[in-house]
Amino acid sequence: MSPSEQQVNELVRQIVEAVHPLRIILFGSAARGEAGPESDIDVMVVMPEGTNHIETLGFLHTQLHGLGFGVDIVVVTPQELARYGDDIGFVYHDALREGKELYAAAA
């Protein structure tokens, strides 16, 4: 089942509460308005430099289990976005080009 706006907002709330990201960006079919009944949600979670990607991803999957829809998460740092964001071969490029920012931490 394709998630509603309320469910996406709940996803964002849970991610923010769990790992305190710098940004959360929705990308993929949901960001393009093309999500179907079987679509998952693709989110890029921008974390501070020095973050352990694997630990953060594992923790998020544990925290987000049971949402009722699929979530694909990409964990990235600002330095990685700056370095690879313009490279067409990286998912970062697509996320930055077509994505919608759902959350930005206060500066």
Q: Could you describe each region identified by the protein language model?
A:
Residues 1-23, 32-37, 48-107:
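Catalytic core of pol beta-like nucleotidyltransferases
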Residues 27-29:
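Glycine-rich beta-strand-to-loop/alpha-helix junction loops that act as flexible
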Residues 40-42:
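Structural signature of the urease/amidohydrolase superfamily beta/alpha-barrel
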Residues 44-46:
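Short hydrophobic/aromatic beta-strand micro-patches
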